[in-house]
Amino acid sequence: MTMQKGAWINFAALVLVNLLWAAQYPAYKIAGNNMESATLNFWTLLLASFLLVPLWLREKQKRKNVGRAFEWKTFREYLLLGLFGIVPPSVMLSWGIARSSASNAAILSLTIPVLMTGLGVLMLGEKLSLIRVFSLLLGLVGTLLVSTSDLSQASFSRSLLLGNFVILLAGLGSAFYNTYSKDLLSRYSELEVLIFSYAVGMAACAIISAAFETKPFYLIAGYSSATWFAVTVLGLLSWGVAMVLWMWVLNRIEVGQISTSIYLLPLFGLILSIVTVHDRITLPQILGGALTVAGTATLTLFEGRRSAHMTGSGSH
């Protein structure tokens, strides 16, 4: 009964995470109209860190064993996570969309759960079960039905090849961040992984902004209140609260189990557009939403309970 309750908690947390992540779509659109990519992500990560650091300090007070000497190995791990896990899905994604399209990015992002599952097998030795393959297919089909407008507007012509390739690399970076974070969570707390990877990401964004952008990150005058509100939403909700919950669930279940939940993101993006701008919803989109939820529930509820049952049986 306890395991079943835990599985439902994981499922509810993943639903909430994707709902908070969906808020980044309108927020990035508003902020991106005024701020360049590296500057935007620098301030987003900084605001998220302002939220996380007090929680981490409180954690250190409660758990004395969390504090440890910062060795070269630790620095190297967070440098790797920040450069290859934070910069690609933030700066590179924005750069790729500018040279491709948002519709192409939405379609190419469907590869992230598949990439996560594959990296989980290669990097962490996770098993590729039939349930995981079935859930991935279920979520993929559901997301394609939800994203019918993106499919109709997508274009993969040769002129957009570079942008599409960079978007794909951004998706790989996102998958790497989640998978490598799972490995680091065996040695560090959720807040440590987030804060130190964000610090590396901020440093990289600051360097990119100062070197290549027309208005460096430290020139903050001239941005509207709407821009700063959007950045605040991104920092506190999408990269703050949502990522804490995501890391908490990632520490409880395998990468392969959590991957399909990312297919909920387009569903909540659609729901938010219906609520805010009164977009019309179609029957295929309703069916797609149901399939996406079913795919996530299958992994977080059914496989988690099945794994726990097998573990319990093996211990007798």
Q: Model segments located where?
A:
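Glycine-/small-residue-enriched transmembrane alpha-helix faces in small-molecule transporters
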Residues: 1-42, 156-183, 203-207, 311-316
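Hydrophobic alpha-helical transmembrane segments of multi-pass integral membrane proteins
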Residues: 9-13, 39-58, 80, 135-141, ...
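Specific transmembrane alpha-helical segments of multi-pass solute transporters/efflux pumps
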Residues: 20, 24-25, 53-109, 145, ...
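Membrane-interface helix termini and inter-helical loops of multi-pass transporters
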Residues: 26-34, 65-66, 98, 147-160, ...
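Hydrophobic/aromatic residues within transmembrane alpha-helices
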Residues: 31, 40, 44, 96, ...
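Helix-helix packing/entry segments at the starts of transmembrane helices
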Residues: 41-43, 86, 90, 102-111, ...
